[in-house]
Curated annotation (Swiss-Prot):
Naturally occurring in which organism (per UniProt): Burkholderia vietnamiensis (strain G4 / LMG 22486) (Burkholderia cepacia (strain R1808))
Functional summary from the UniProt entry: Cell division inhibitor that blocks the formation of polar Z ring septums. Rapidly oscillates between the poles of the cell to destabilize FtsZ filaments that have formed before they mature into polar Z rings. Prevents FtsZ polymerization.
Protein's UniProt keywords contain Cell cycle: yes
PANTHER family on file: SEPTUM SITE-DETERMINING PROTEIN MINC
Name of the protein in its database record: Probable septum site-determining protein MinC
Region (Disordered) location: 105-143
Biological classification of the source: Bacteria, Pseudomonadati, Pseudomonadota, Betaproteobacteria, Burkholderiales
Keywords assigned by UniProt, alphabetized: Cell cycle, Cell division, Septation
Length: 256
């Protein structure tokens, strides 16, 4: 007997990309306090973001109450959809969340961590390490096995673009819009929304932008928001953004 294809739904194999919330401690009180501190200042940046709880950074034998962490994330308006764990962490299946497989090789770059506020990662701070601005828009390292995605339309508030390789945007990214890439991001227009590069732990990824006015910028989990205003010499200017020793460095670009 043959079965007709349903006109109403299909079940197909596929994959869904999500960001990782990496748990580094079993002290849930400290974790809760840090969550509140981290997100109360900029709640809208992460509202309704889908995340997977990553417990691979915990030491062997350590366990946490994943149901409590799930509730913590719900309290800050994030949506946990699964758990990423080592094969030896069988207890992770007890939370009632599905076990997910992460593609990253470094083992846990979670939701972005803020750049060190004690040393603002701006062009002035990077002067000693890089005395001259970068000469051109060029990717720092190729992303293997993934095609570059090119977007030539404006992105409005609420829209999101995800690229498995490098991402090139040729139109403005408005407030409330989000662009995410596993590789580098090139924006040949004003960036007023959020840009997250190297989201699966690519510390060599960079962001290149001809007009920097962002809500948030992030590379490999290290992020910076407008809570820490950008200096006048890079705000609205052409820049490149890279990581140096876990700090975001924002440097002018020489385009002529």
């Amino acid at each position: 007997m043959s079965l007709k294809k349903s006109p109403f739904f299909e079940l197909r194999s596929g994959s869904v990309d999500t960001l990782l919330f990496t748990v580094k401690t079993t002290d849930l009180d400290a974790l809760r306090a840090e969550l509140v501190k981290r997100f109360e200042a900029t709640p809208e940046f992460f509202a309704d973001d889908v995340v997977a709880i990553d417990v691979r950074r915990l030491a062997e034998g350590e366990r946490v109450a994943l149901s409590d962490i799930r509730q913590m994330l719900n309290d800050v308006r994030m949506r946990p959809v699964g758990v990423v764990a080592q094969a030896s962490q069988a207890w992770a299946a007890e939370a009632g969340l599905p076990l997910l497989e992460a593609r990253d090789r470094r083992g846990a770059t979670a939701k972005p961590e803020p750049a060190d506020e004690a040393e603002p990662p701006v062009a002035a701070a990077a002067a000693e390490a890089v005395p001259e601005p970068a000469p051109e828009l060029a990717p720092s390292a190729p992303t293997t096995g993934a095609q570059t995605l090119v977007i030539d339309r404006p992105l409005r508030s609420g829209q999101q673009i995800y690229a498995k390789g490098d991402l090139v945007v040729l139109a403005p990214v408005s407030h409330g819009a989000e662009i995410i890439a596993e590789g580098n991001i090139h924006i040949y227009a004003p960036l007023r929304g959020r840009a997250l590069a190297g989201v699966h732990g690519n510390h060599d990824a960079r962001i290149f932008c001809t007009c920097l006015e962002p809500e948030l910028i992030s590379i490999a989990g290290i992020y910076r928001t407008t809570e820490n205003p950008l200096p006048a010499d890079i705000l609205g200017k052409a820049v490149q953004i890279r990581l140096e020793e876990e700090k975001l460095m924002i440097e002018p670009l020489r385009l002529t």
